[in-house]
């Protein structure tokens, strides 16, 4: 379900402070965050976030087509190792 327009997009306050500092200083350093729930805003284009996926920090470079999505969408938390292979059936026993 979409968020109400009157509420506006959600960004954690500590992440917003880091964004403001980076824009003020014109700094391109990686912004480290655990806040996967923060929405990507237009002012963050060109910045790189290190988003925690539960085990490590995944670097996410913000582009135009990411606006409106959440940071966590670009840092997968699960690794897929593939489905188990079916073992070859044993040769039929002879009578």
Curated annotation (Swiss-Prot):
It comes from the Bacteria. Pfam families: Ribosomal_S19. One of its GO terms (molecular function) is structural constituent of ribosome. Keywords: Ribonucleoprotein, Ribosomal protein, RNA-binding, rRNA-binding. GO terms for cellular component: cytoplasm; small ribosomal subunit. Protein S19 forms a complex with S13 that binds strongly to the 16S ribosomal RNA. Belongs to the universal ribosomal protein uS19 family. This is Small ribosomal subunit protein uS19.
